[in-house]
Design a protein with these regions (language model features):
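Alpha/beta enzyme core
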Residues: 3-8, 14-44, 57-61, 65, ...
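A mid-to-C-terminal "edge-of-domain" accessory segment
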Residues: 5-6, 10-12, 251, 257-441, ...
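Small-aliphatic-rich amphipathic alpha-helix that forms the alpha element of a beta-alpha
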Residues: 207-233
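Non-catalytic terminal/interface segments that mediate subunit docking, oligomerization
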Residues: 18, 23, 31, 166, ...
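A glycine-rich helix N-cap at a beta->alpha junction
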Residues: 69-74
Length: 535
């Protein structure tokens, strides 16, 4: 059976840039565009030329894309102006792009209140603008803003807006759930009705927002109902609650039975294996920790903790996994916790590359130690590096790179020379490396920061291994109430190549807990990078 072609349209660089706290540079946009092109999307919307200096510069030279078309976004001409005499439209038409996507109203309420013009005038704005864009680029698209709200209020007018764009030469008329409030059953019904009116959905697209956590579901239902273009963003970036997440949509369209059998999104199985890396590239660029629980690509998406689950997964992964993790470039993780059985432990050791004898009595000691530590507050299911350090130490496979003799942290609150009240933290660390005693003193913006700097200030001959080590996240959880509470500290570290790992420490003293986690982080990196202790 021939499959229907569905085209992926990425708007990370335009709609995704509306995310609170996100501000792409021109170089950021170029990097993301290359990643999207490698992934295999059909269209990359680069931004709004003329709206800001960044987008104007980005569109001054078309990026060298091998697979995707480069799209300029903008709005239809303003009321009272011709298409040839509208500065905003002119900036879009001057852009170095392969196509243009113009947004316009399709809800009569918006036409009356926001534009203050007649419905006929709005239809004219759409048609004239699309004609101009089609003449300039050869491919024009119309984003029907508020289409679903407009259709529910006045289906005839919303349909007229879509038809006006298509009749004017638009390759695509994209149905936008701009406010994000439409439900999946409504999307399926409305798209189905529109497809029936037009006779085909081959020139229709869908653009959804995630205000009810239904953006992906709404997009899938629209495809089932007949649209052939799907818009979204990497990791669901977008204004308010975000847009449809292409990272979740792509594998669903490729791997889930109905979509796999009926549509072709122009991506290969090999392309799909780049999905996890693409998602994490964006997070790294934004300096954000990846969402561990993200569908398909999260670190926990294929993580198994319960002993019964692990035993079954090792026999056949289909028992607890809906798709193979490697199909999306992810990996399976077997977690260690107080629920862990021996099977979990052995699998986790194998994954970490730790050699063991199944008859080694120290394996039982390790399992009991893990359970005891978790009872005290440790959590190894999210701190794989700390688990590996503990396991290797118990099994006699952890080198002793250095010894900490003592550390001290002081916090002083005083007035500085300018009469300002400041709080200063200072840490001192005394350690032995190859029999030599080293002292390090460092200040920080807090006691943990100062201790981190002091630990990494001078490790003798190991210093080169940790020069690119940095602490990127620090989480504290109070495990029981009161001033004598036990504290758990979880630290996320990273290196210059973007690799990240997690370590954990527990103590009634928050500084001591942080010290344990910091020590595990440093020792794990030395181990991973092949540092060798003196004989």
């Amino acid at each position: 059976m021939a499959k229907d072609r569905v085209y992926l349209f990425d708007t990370t660089l335009r709609d995704g840039a509306q995310t609170q706290g996100v501000d792409f540079s021109v170089e950021d946009k170029r990097l993301i565009a290359r990643a999207l092109d490698k992934l295999g999307v059909a269209y990359i919307e680069g931004g709004w030329p003329g709206a800001n200096p960044t987008d104007s510069e980005f569109f001054s030279e078309k990026p060298a894309l091998k697979r995707a078309k480069f799209v300029a976004f903008g709005m239809t001409k303003r009321p009272g102006r011709s298409a040839a005499n509208d500065p905003g439209l002119a900036a879009i038409l001057d852009a170095k792009a392969d196509a243009a996507c113009l947004v316009g109203k399709s809800w009569d309420f918006q036409v009356d209140v926001a534009l203050g013009i007649t419905k006929a005038e709005n239809i004219e704005l759409i048609a004239d603008s699309i004609v101009a864009a089609h003449k300039r680029f050869g491919e024009a698209m119309f984003d029907a803003e508020h289409f679903f709200d407009g259709y529910k209020a006045n289906p005839d007018f919303a349909t007229q807006c879509v038809k006006a764009a298509l009749d004017a030469g638009a390759r695509w008329a994209v149905l936008c759930d701009t406010n994000g409030g439409t439900m999946p059953d409504e999307v399926e019904r409305i798209v189905g009705e529109l497809v029936a009116k037009l006779g085909s959905g081959d020139r229709l697209g869908i653009h959804t927002h995630n205000d009810t956590e239904n953006a992906v579901a709404n997009s899938l239902m629209a495809v089932k109902a007949g649209v052939r273009q799907v818009q979204g963003t990497l990791n669901g970036l977008g204004e308010r609650c975000g847009n449809a997440n292409l990272i979740a949509l792509i594998p669903s369209l490729m791997l889930k039975p109905w979509f796999r059998d009926h549509v072709d999104i122009g991506m290969s199985e090999q392309d799909l294996t780049h999905l996890t890396a693409t998602s994490r590239t964006l997070d790294e660029l934004l300096n954000r920790a990846p969402n561990r629980h993200a569908a398909y690509v999260g670190a926990s998406a294929f993580a198994h903790k319960g002993g019964l689950h692990v035993s079954a997964v090792m026999k056949d992964p289909r028992t607890y996994e809906h798709v193979p993790p490697e199909s999306v470039g992810n990996t399976r993780k077997i977690l260690i916790s107080d629920q862990a059985g021996r099977s979990n432990l052995l699998v986790r050791l194998t994954e970490a590359g730790i050699k063991y004898d199944p008859n080694d009595s120290r394996l039982n000691l390790l399992l009991e130690d893990v359970k005891q530590r978790e009872a005290e507050g440790y959590s190894y299911d999210g701190a794989e590096a700390s688990f590996e350090v503990l396991a290797r130490r118990t099994l006699g496979q952890m080198p002793e790179f250095f010894k900490i003799r003592s550390f001290r942290v002081m916090v002083e609150r005083r007035f500085n020379a300018r009469g300002e009240l400041v709080t200063i933290s200072e840490a001192t660390v005394k350690l032995n490396v190859d029999g030599e005693t080293l002292f390090s003193v460092a200040e920080g913006n807090g006691p943990v920061n100062a201790l981190d700097h002091a630990l990494r200030k001078d490790l003798g001959r190991y210093q080169a291994y940790i020069d690119d080590l940095r602490l990127v996240d620090f989480k504290v959880r109070i495990l029981n109430g009161g001033t004598e509470a036990t504290t758990r500290v979880m630290i996320e570290s990273a290196d210059g190549q973007g690799n990240r790992w997690f370590t954990v420490g527990v103590s009634p003293n928050i500084i001591d807990a942080a010290f344990v986690a910091l020590m595990d982080s440093i020792q794990w990196k030395l181990l991973r990078d092949g540092a060798q202790p003196s004989k």
